[in-house]
Regions:
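Flexible, solvent-exposed coil segments and beta strand-coil junctions
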Residues: 43-51, 130-143, 195-202
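Conserved small-residue
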Residues: 1-59, 180-182, 187
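Membrane-embedded beta-strand positions of outer-membrane beta-barrel proteins
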Residues: 81, 175-177, 220
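Extracytoplasmic gating/loop element in the C-terminal half of outer-membrane beta-barrel translocons
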Residues: 1-11, 21-22, 31-35, 86-174, ...
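Repeated loop/turn-to-beta-strand initiation elements of outer-membrane beta-barrel proteins
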Residues: 76-81, 166-167
Length: 224
């Protein structure tokens, strides 16, 4: 799209569920829509839901990235940390869609949010979760699996202690304990981490990628 970020997400915007037969008359519908299907936003306002109603829903690149680092020293001790953060980007959970779209059926294990699904007009659910056997809209890429990649992360913490030596054989020694990728605060529910993706350098979709490993390192530096 002209004047839009590269690799932008262009898809249907899911705004609810057709909960009753009256909803099919009240709201714009897609061909073969039925009660219990996902309801999409009529982006162009023509009263019909079709390919022309796909719209720009986000982009993988964050608007801002942040970082803060510092080192504290007290006598022979030192403590350093690195905190990183970002805001304004999105990621598409392909794994979530593969496992969780309508039409997959209710005969196997399903995610917990299906407890609130549409079952009938008498049991319409939460108004956001369609019928699990309603396959009409399950084939489409839509905003239900598009997530924010905003996060704050404790990337690195190192605690060190310098051992004093009076003899000249060893000039200096420092013992340290380092933790990497210790904590992350985010709202991503489509996978393990908003940093994990299968898009390579593009970072636009996640198909169950592993998060960055948490690493604990104990080491010693010695100067002779």
């Amino acid at each position: 799209m002209v004047d839009q970020p590269l690799r932008s997400f262009y898809m249907y915007d899911a705004v609810g569920v057709y909960q009753t037969q009256a909803d099919l008359q009240k709201y714009p519908v897609m061909q073969n829509s039925k009660v219990g299907d996902v309801r999409y936003r009529d982006a162009n306002g023509d009263g019909v839901i079709n390919d022309s109603d796909r719209t720009l829903m986000g982009k993988p690149d964050p608007d801002y990235t942040f970082g803060i680092t510092n080192t504290f020293k007290y006598k022979n001790f030192d403590l350093s940390f690195l905190i990183t953060a970002q805001t304004g980007g999105q990621i598409y959970s392909v794994l979530g869609r593969a496992m969780d779209r309508p039409g997959m059926g209710a005969n196997g294990n399903v995610l917990s949010h299906w407890k609130n699904m549409w079952k009938s007009e008498a049991e319409p659910g939460d108004g956001k979760t369609p019928g699990i056997d309603n396959a009409n809209t399950g084939q489409f890429y839509d905003s239900r699996w598009l997530y924010s990649t905003d996060f704050i992360k404790l990337k690195n913490v190192t605690l060190g202690y310098r051992i004093p030596f009076k003899k000249k054989l060893i000039q200096n020694a420092r013992v340290y304990l380092t933790g990497e990728n210790l904590l992350m605060w985010d709202k991503y529910e489509g996978g393990f981490s908003p940093e994990a993706n299968n898009g390579g350098s593009t970072g636009d979709y996640d198909y169950g990628s592993y998060p960055q490993a948490r690493v604990i390192t104990l080491g010693v530096n010695v100067t002779f």
